[in-house]
Each structure stands twice: as C-alpha cells, then as structure tokens.
C-alpha cells in the first residue's frame, strides 16, 4: 500500500486534472484554526467562488476518515469549520491521522504534499510558515520551508506571516533553492503589510510570466516548489510599525504563557486579532481572497503552456 491509496479526489477535480484544466489547491487550517464559525464557512464558500469565477476549479484539502481529501463536499466543509476535535496536521502528523482515522486540517506543508500527490501544481494560501523569531534559541522552523524545498507546487501567498523572522525565512529559502517571485512587486510582503523591508528574488509582471517560470523550473528537472509573493491589496494594508508593536506584545504573552510548537501561530494570530480590534482578521480575509484570485489566474495560464 502506498500513500496514493489514501488519496480521495472529488470526481469534478479528478476530471479537471485528467483533462489538463486549471485546479487550485486550498488549505483547511485557516478554516479550523484561523477564524470562528460560521464566518469561516462563509469564507470557504467565498474563496471557492472566487476560484471558479477566475476559470479554475477549487480543491480544498483535509484529512477525514483516514483519507487525504482533495475537494470537500458541503458536509465535509461544515466539519472542518465547526472544528470539533479537528487537529492541525503537518507532514509529521499525516501517518498518525491516516492510521487512526482522525480528522485533520491541512497546513501549507500538508496541502502541498496532498496537492502534489493529486497532480495539482498551484496552491493559494494566506501566508506561509517560516523561521520564528527567536529560532536561534528555540529552533522553531516551520515544516512549510522543507516542503517548498522538495515538493513541486507553487504557493501563492501574501509573503510569510508577519509574526515570523522574515529575514531568516528568506535566507532559509535561498539555502534550499526555492525561488521567491513577486507578483508585480520588488518588495517581499509581510502578510498584513505590503512591505517587509526585504526584497523578492524576481519581480514577475503578470500571471503568464509566473506560469512560465514555474513550468520551466519543473521542465528542466529542478526539485521543489516556488514561493509566489502577492502583496495584500493597498486598501486593506495595516501599518507596519503599529503591527510590529502588536506582534511584540503577542509574542510576550506567548512567552509568559509557555506557548510553543504548533500552538504558537494560532495563539499569536488570535491575540493579534484581539489587539487590533478585529482589524487583522478583516485584512487576513482580503489577502486570502486576493491570493486565490491570483493563483487561479496563474493556474489558467499554466494550463495554456505547451
């Protein structure tokens, strides 16, 4: 038995893959661990609607009933959004969840893994995980970065989550040979903010150019994925200095309460939401919608290439 035996792809998605039509993978951690019910369910429907509106097929991923699900029906989306007993699954957790039949929400790393197994090359998310602040002492580095180094999926995101050490995250990606491509920008975005103070490797002018870059990477046999950095729309951007103050307060709270490991990111995002009066969640929604839109356009262009 191989890992592909655990794969369960919705018929509509499988048909699109077989016919070479554009498909965009979506994660489920943002649903189960990123926002409350029923707002998360509305968000899930909105994202899928945006993907379809751009001419692609949405493929939300999860682990349910011992299966790697690619495409969720209404009942399965409800399960992920109500999040009763739903765990957060990274690569290390996959075998446990498959063996025990537990329900798990997919992180960036796990979504990349599942998408690759299904033959999906394009994935939209909010922001990737990376090297945490203080990682020189804690060694807290997201598995997302190793997945980007080895799994052939392009991840469209609003940069790295601003709670991270963005400079070290970019250094790690460079070491692992992962290209960081900006969507019509020279600046690497910091999730809620359009600029982080760091630069992308390449500024691509449009979806067609990005599609050609990633296809060429895989055509010539280079391993791994690509990080496509798509800044949050200007009207939803939050002030960088204000966000740094908020993030530092949330980090202090996490340290005081002994929060670490996989609990760190959900804790920080929840407290940042509270400290910004909900403003950060509104920005999070809009950047995720924008990433889904751009990812769909890249997927459409990718499927046109010979």
Predicted regions and their residues:
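General beta-strand structural signal in soluble alpha/beta enzymes
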Residues: 24-26, 58-63, 104, 122-127, ...
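A C-terminal functional module that forms or caps the active site or interfaces directly
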Residues: 224-290
């Amino acid at each position: 038995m191989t890992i592909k035996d655990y794969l369960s792809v919705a018929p509509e998605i499988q048909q699109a893959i077989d016919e070479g039509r554009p498909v965009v993978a979506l994660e489920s951690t943002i649903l189960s661990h990123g926002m409350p019910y029923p707002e998360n369910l509305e968000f899930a429907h909105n994202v899928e609607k945006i993907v379809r509106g751009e001419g692609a097929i949405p493929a939300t991923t999860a682990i349910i009933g011992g299966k790697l699900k690619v495409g969720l029906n209404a009942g399965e989306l409800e399960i992920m959004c109500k999040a009763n007993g739903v765990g957060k699954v990274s690569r290390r957790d996959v075998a446990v969840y498959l063996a025990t039949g537990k329900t798990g929400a997919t992180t960036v790393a796990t979504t990349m893994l599942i998408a690759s197994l299904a033959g999906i090359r394009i994935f939209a998310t909010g922001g990737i995980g990376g090297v945490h602040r203080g990682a020189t002492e804690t060694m807290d580095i997201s598995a997302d970065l190793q997945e980007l180094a080895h799994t052939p999926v392009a991840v469209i995101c609003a940069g790295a989550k601003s709670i991270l050490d963005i400079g070290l995250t970019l250094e790690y990606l460079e070491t692992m040979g992962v290209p960081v491509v900006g969507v019509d920008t020279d600046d690497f975005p910091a999730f809620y903010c359009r600029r982080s103070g760091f630069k992308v490797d390449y500024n691509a002018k449009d979806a067609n150019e990005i599609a050609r870059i990633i296809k060429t990477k895989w055509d010539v046999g280079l391993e791994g994925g690509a990080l496509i950095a798509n800044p949050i729309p200007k009207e939803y951007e939050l002030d960088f200095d204000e966000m740094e103050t908020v993030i530092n307060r949330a980090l202090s709270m996490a340290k005081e309460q002994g929060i670490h490991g996989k609990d760190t990111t959900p804790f920080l995002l929840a407290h940042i939401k509270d400290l910004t009066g909900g403003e950060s969640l509104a920005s999070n929604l809009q950047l995720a919608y924008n990433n889904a839109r751009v990812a769909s356009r890249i997927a459409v262009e990718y499927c046109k290439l010979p």
